[in-house]
C-alpha cells in the first residue's frame, strides 16, 4: 500500500478537526485494513510538519524529537503513530515542501513572483530552505518500493545539496527564462518585525526562515536523487512558466 492522500497545510484553514479526520483517522482506518489483509509493506507519505514547524536553527535529521507546531503537523504525527500501532510493516517518508507541475500554495506563489517581470527586493535574504522536486520524490518512492522488506523506519526526504536561499531561487528561475535577476537590496529586519508584532511570525518563517533537511539516511541506504533545487525549479520554469503565472495567492 502506498498512501499519498492527505490534507496539507493551508494558511486559511484553522479547523483542527478537519485535519484530524482526513490525515489521522483516515490513515488509522486504512492501516487497520492493511494489517487485517496481511499487507507486507505500507508506505506513508507524511510531512516534515510532523517533526517541525516552518523554521529550524539546525539541519533536521530523523533523530530529532518530533515537535509539530500546528494542527496539520499534529495530525500527520498522529497518523504515523497509528500506523506503527497497527502492526503492519511500514516505511514513513517525511517530505519537505514539494514543487512540480500543478503545485499550489505558498511556494507556488513565491515562484509566481519569480517569473514576474518586476524587480524584487530580496537580494539580502540569506535564509536557506529545503524543498523536494516531484521527480526526486518519485525516485525516493520507487527506491522504497523496491526494498526487499519494509524498513519500519522514518526517512526525511528533500532535494540534495546546500538548500537555496530566496535570492538563489529567483536567480535560478530568471536565468532559466534568459532574464537578468533584477534583485534589489533590502533591509530584512524591517520586513520581519512588523509581522512578528502582528503575531504573523509563521508567515515570515514559512517564506524567510531557515528550514534545512538532511536526507543522508535514505541516501546512505542507496537512494540517488536526480537533481538539486536550483536545477529543479529551473526545469519547472522552462516547462511550466505560463502556468506559474496563473497561480493564485495562498489564503491569509
Locate the predicted segments by residue:
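Active-site Tyr-X1-5-Lys
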Residues: 67-93
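Glycine-rich NAD(P)-binding loop of the Rossmann-fold in SDR/ketoreductase-type enzymes
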Residues: 18-29, 66, 70, 74-75, ...
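Glycine-rich Rossmann NAD(P)(H)-binding loop
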Residues: 100, 122-127, 155-163, 172-178, ...
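NAD(P)H-binding glycine-rich loop region in Rossmannoid oxidoreductase-like domains
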Residues: 1-25, 29, 33, 50-51
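Mid/C-terminal beta-alpha module of Rossmann-like enzyme folds, strongest
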Residues: 143-203, 234-237, 243-252
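Conserved Rossmann-fold NAD(P)-dependent oxidoreductase catalytic core, especially the SDR/UDP-sugar
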Residues: 28-71, 91
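Substrate-positioning beta->alpha
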Residues: 74, 103-109, 123-146, 152-156
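Flexible, glycine-rich beta-alpha linker
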Residues: 52, 91-109
Amino acid at each position: 500500500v502506498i498512501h499519498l492522500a492527505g490534507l496539507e497545510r493551508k494558511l486559511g484553514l484553522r479547523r483542527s478537526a478537519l485535519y484530524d479526520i482526513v490525515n489521522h483517522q483516515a490513515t488509522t482506518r486504512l492501516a487497520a485494513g492493511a494489517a487485517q489483509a496481511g499487507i507486507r509493506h505500507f508506505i506513508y507519505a507524511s510531512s516534515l510538519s510532523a517533526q517541525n514547524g516552518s523554521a529550524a536553527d539546525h539541519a533536521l535529521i530523523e533523530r530529532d524529537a518530533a515537535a509539530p507546531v500546528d494542527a496539520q503537523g499534529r495530525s500527520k504525527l498522529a497518523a504515523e503513530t497509528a500506523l506503527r500501532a497497527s502492526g503492519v510493516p511500514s516505511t514513513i517518508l517525511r517530505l519537505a515542501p514539494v514543487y512540480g507541475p500543478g503545485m499550489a500554495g505558498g511556494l507556488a506563489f513565491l515562484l509566481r513572483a519569480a517569473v514576474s517581470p518586476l524587480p524584487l527586493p530580496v537580494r539580502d535574504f540569506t535564509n536557506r530552505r529545503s524543498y523536494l522536486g516531484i521527480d526526486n520524490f518519485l525516485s525516493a518512492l520507487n527506491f522504497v518500493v523496491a526494498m526487499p522488506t519494509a524498513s519500519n523506519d522514518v526517512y526525511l526526504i528533500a532535494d540534495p545539496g546546500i538548500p537555496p536561499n530566496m535570492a538563489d531561487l529567483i536567480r535560478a528561475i530568471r536565468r532559466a527564462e534568459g532574464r537578468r535577476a533584477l534583485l534589489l537590496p533590502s533591509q530584512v529586519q524591517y520586513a520581519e518585525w512588523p509581522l512578528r508584532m502582528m503575531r504573523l511570525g509563521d508567515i515570515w518563517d514559512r517564506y524567510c526562515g531557515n528550514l534545512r533537511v538532511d536526507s543522508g539516511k535514505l541516501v546512505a541506504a542507496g537512494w540517488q536523487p536526480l537533481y538539486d533545487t536550483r536545477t529543479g525549479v529551473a526545469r519547472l520554469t522552462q516547462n511550466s512558466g505560463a502556468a506559474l503565472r496563473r497561480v493564485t495567492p495562498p489564503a491569509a
